[in-house]
């Protein structure tokens, strides 16, 4: 376990030194605090970023999905809310029993409850990346049935609780969950070993956004319904823009 945490720490430094190429659509301009600070919108997107990512939405999958949803005029407006600041996205929290801190899970629950109480007519979609997926796995099961019914869909990228929770979020309909686990991403197999595949999920955000839009389209505008069939999926590995030298470094993690 100690070696794996050291690997994560080293990886954080390398990911800063050799970031993936992100265009303006992916970086976006949302503060990630729209629910707390702004007016109610027809749709609320709640997202938990990956470990070490800055801000409330992070700088990869969160802003990309947020901006895709905001660009869909048919939704009538979207409030994007990141989980934080109690969720610090620290590396060490990955080793906790729930894959993140209790403070992070409780904060996410409070945001879902805030969306439902402040904006009773809003429809909710959610997501998480890496440690952020553990935040969603921890928060959603304990929500009231009324709030769960308001959630149209949840997208999880590089799901660190995929194996532990059986490819689902407990006590939540499987047809409302879309899991992206790239080939070779070992965190999806229940480990803390991070490989290059864990950084490929920006390539899946367009598909994930469209899926959330489809989920919203199937939900009535002011109320929501839940169901129980399964549609959780795995995504193929996509090419990373990092150097071959970095890839070689990753290949030695498990040795």
From Swiss-Prot:
Thermal dependence reads: Optimum temperature is 60 degrees Celsius.
Q: Which residues cross the membrane?
A: none
**Which region ranges are annotated with the description Disordered?**
219-255
An example GO BP is:
carbohydrate catabolic process
Biotech applications: May be exploited in the production of biodiesel.
The record's top EC class is: hydrolase
Q: Which InterPro entries match?
A: AB_hydrolase_fold, Cutinase/axe, CUTINASE_1, CUTINASE_2, Cutinase_monf
Q: Which residues form the active site?
A: 130 (nucleophile), 185, 198 (proton donor/acceptor)
Record lineage: Eukaryota, Fungi, Dikarya, Ascomycota, Pezizomycotina
Listed as disulfide-bonded, the cysteine pairs are 40-119, 66-80, 181-188
Q: Which family does it belong to?
A: Belongs to the cutinase family.
Does the record's keyword annotation contain Signal?
yes
The gene it comes from is cut2
Signal sequence interval, chain numbering: 1-17
Stored Pfam families: Cutinase
Has the keyword Signal been applied to this entry?
A: yes
Q: Which GO terms describe its molecular function?
A: cutinase activity
Compartments reported by the entry: Secreted
* Site residues by UniProt (Transition state stabilizer): 51, 131
* Entry's induction text: Induced during growth on cutin, in a manner dependent on transcription factors FarA and FARB. Induced during growth on olive oil. Not induced during growth on the lipidic carbon sources 16-hydroxyhexadecanoic acid and propyl ricinoleate (synthetic cutin monomers), or triacetin and triesterate (triglycerides). Repressed during growth on glucose and on starch.
UniProt name for this protein: Cutinase 2
Activity regulation information from UniProt: Partially inhibited by the serine protease inhibitor phenylmethanesulfonyl fluoride. Inhibited by various ions, including copper, iron, sodium, potassium, magnesium and calcium. Inhibited by the chelating agent EDTA (ethylenediaminetetraacetic acid). Inhibited by the surfactants sodium dodecyl sulfate and polysorbate 80.
- What biological function has been recorded for the protein in this entry? Catalyzes the hydrolysis of complex carboxylic polyesters found in the cell wall of plants. Degrades cutin, a macromolecule that forms the structure of the plant cuticle. Also degrades suberin, a specialized macromolecule found in the cell wall of various plant tissues.
Low complexity composition bias: which ranges?
Answer: 220-255
Question: Across the pH scale, how does activity change?
Answer: Optimum pH is 9-10.
Q: Which GO terms describe its cellular component?
A: extracellular region
């Amino acid at each position: 376990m100690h070696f794996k945490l050291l690997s994560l720490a080293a990886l954080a430094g390398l990911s800063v030194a050799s970031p993936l190429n992100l265009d303006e659509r992916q970086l976006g301009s949302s503060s990630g605090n729209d629910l707390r600070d702004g007016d109610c919108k027809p749709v609320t997107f709640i997202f938990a970023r990956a470990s070490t990512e800055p801000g409330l939405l992070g700088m990869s999958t969160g802003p990309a999905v947020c901006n895709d949803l905001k660009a869909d005029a048919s939704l009538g407006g979207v409030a994007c809310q990141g989980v934080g600041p109690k969720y610090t996205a620290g590396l060490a929290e990955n080793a906790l029993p729930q894959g993140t801190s209790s403070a992070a899970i409780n904060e996410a629950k409070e945001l879902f409850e805030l969306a439902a109480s402040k904006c009773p007519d809003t429809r909710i979609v959610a997501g998480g990346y890496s440690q952020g997926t553990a935040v969603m796995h921890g928060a959603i099961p304990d929500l009231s049935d009324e709030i769960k019914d308001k959630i149209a869909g949840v997208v999880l990228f590089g799901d660190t609780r995929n194996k532990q929770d059986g490819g689902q979020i407990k006590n939540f309909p499987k047809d409302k969950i879309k899991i992206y686990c790239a080939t070779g991403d070992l965190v999806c197999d229940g480990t803390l070993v991070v490989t290059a595949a864990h950084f490929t999920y920006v390539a899946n955000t367009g598909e994930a956004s469209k899926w959330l839009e489809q989920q919203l389209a199937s939900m009535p505008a002011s109320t929501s319904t839940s169901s129980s069939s399964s549609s959780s999926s795995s995504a193929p590995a996509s090419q990373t823009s990092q150097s071959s030298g970095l890839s070689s470094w990753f290949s030695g993690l498990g040795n």
